[in-house]
């Protein structure tokens, strides 16, 4: 005869079996989508990172193209470029459609010192300069960029959790496509005491934070996708006396095809950027 206690144990076991369906695959869905990864694709270095909180799909296309689509909670950043980075004229084109907090930027890292840097070309509803320290401005590639510095304490980095500075150049007229002359920003940062170290990777990146959106970006450069040379400084032009006898202030234009203003610098030296533009840095 089965005891009452044994009957209750058997009934409880049957109840547990009936409570959970045999097919419970819905519990195993990976909401993060594409996992974090780095590597090469189409002759370019790529980096994609996510904290796993968002629904995100990152896809490498041919050559310098990549596509990114995301939504939901979480942080993610991905794109194509070079490893190591360097001072070069980076070209990019495509589409960028953010909804919320997101950046489209030339993005990278250096070590010794550990620096995370952004040249922000476009952004969503949140201005990345919020709460940052304004250091100055630089004129490059047809626009003014405001320069900021922030510090990150015990945050994720390319060497693990660390404390480091972030350098920002934020374009004041948003765009999606054009040329980013990285050396102009590196030189301007240096002139402001914002020193960089040894270059790690450098990409044209899309970043999203608790937001949604999509991007389809193609990256290139004047030196080709495979270039990974050492950082170089722009040539220096010798100062000359201006027609009016007054030299330009720091960050002002001091040369270029068709330029008729002052060709000397009261502060800094006249640095050549391209045939159309030189600047006091």
Swiss-Prot record:
Q: Which residues form the signal peptide?
A: 1-19
SMART domains attached to this UniProt entry: fCBD (SM00236)
Q: Which residues form the GH11 domain?
A: 32-220
Metabolic or biological pathway, per its Swiss-Prot or TrEMBL entry: Glycan degradation; xylan degradation
Catalytic center residues: 116, 207
Where is carbohydrate linked to this protein? Answer: 23
Reaction equations catalysed: Endohydrolysis of (1->4)-beta-D-xylosidic linkages in xylans
Answer whether the UniProt record assigns the keyword Lipid biosynthesis to this protein.
Answer: no
Swiss-Prot/TrEMBL keywords:
Carbohydrate metabolism, Glycoprotein, Glycosidase, Hydrolase, Polysaccharide degradation, Signal, Xylan degradation
The free-text function statement in the UniProt record for this protein reads: Endo-1,4-beta-xylanase involved in the hydrolysis of xylan, a major structural heterogeneous polysaccharide found in plant biomass representing the second most abundant polysaccharide in the biosphere, after cellulose. May act as an elicitor of plant defense responses in certain plants but does not exhibit any cell death when transiently expressed in N.benthamiana.
Its name, as the record gives it, is Ethylene-inducing xylanase 1
Originating species: Botryotinia fuckeliana (strain B05.10) (Noble rot fungus)
